[in-house]
């Protein structure tokens, strides 16, 4: 199957990175190389792109798409390891870092990966298939309380209690092995009126399990800090999020880096000594245009936030 992924907020990202032709840029989520191909077109031979992805299929597709470019380094890893990756490449500082936190169209559409609640597949959801831990372990081995907490916290699902209870009851008969088995359980747990009126009933639960499988939110705060430490003064970091949990983490971390002062508000001046390390380029998240959403409905929930290293 062709690795296809329509780049979201493409022009906005390119503008955000303020690309220098001899700069060093890191695409932390290389995917199908949509953003990266355009970054490379703006680089001279003196510039460099470092593409990171934990999905070997994505790296293979990216290498094929970018084969005409020689100034690319490919890294099979999770972007949370950005500090070690740059250290191993002997690159102390970079000019820009891009993170696109969305699941690719390929991962959603490729049945065998188990990301989609629209296609039957084994319960998997691993971004990095070298890892042993998958959705199967979560669904079949987590306690009811553990399931409830991740579905509520990571999926913001109001019927988390009912869903977790139904999962535990059903798996007592036999293991839950496929996405469609899980979808049927979720549908049975959600009241008919809510199923009719809201988004797909399995959407939030699948999001929650995917986040847990890949530790997506746990690594984000530290990754932002490590990335900012690797930026040159004037270097930019641009992050695209696709749901409110991710966006909240990015927004709060950016604000903290922009205003780290911990002094009580009533103090007339700062005495804690903490100085800003970045400035906010976008106070609010940049959203796709109406035209982009019409062309690519999956971009609807995207938000882009940008900071610049001081």
Curated annotation (Swiss-Prot):
InterPro entries: RsmH, SAM-dep_MeTrfase_MraW_recog, SAM-dependent_MTases_sf
Pfam families: Methyltransf_5
Main location: cytoplasm
Enzyme class, first EC level, given as a word: transferase
Record field: catalytic activity: cytidine(1402) in 16S rRNA + S-adenosyl-L-methionine = N(4)-methylcytidine(1402) in 16S rRNA + S-adenosyl-L-homocysteine + H(+)
Compartments, record wording: Cytoplasm
GO annotation, cellular component aspect: cytoplasm
SUPFAM superfamilies reported in the protein's UniProt record: Putative methyltransferase TM0872, insert domain, S-adenosyl-L-methionine-dependent methyltransferases
Record-listed S-adenosyl-L-methionine binding positions: 33-35, 53, 79, 100, 107
GO MF: rRNA (cytosine-N4-)-methyltransferase activity
PANTHER family: 12S RRNA N4-METHYLCYTIDINE METHYLTRANSFERASE, S-ADENOSYL-METHYLTRANSFERASE MRAW
Function statement: Specifically methylates the N4 position of cytidine in position 1402 (C1402) of 16S rRNA.
Protein known as: Ribosomal RNA small subunit methyltransferase H
Lineage of the species this protein comes from: Bacteria, Bacillati, Bacillota, Clostridia, Eubacteriales
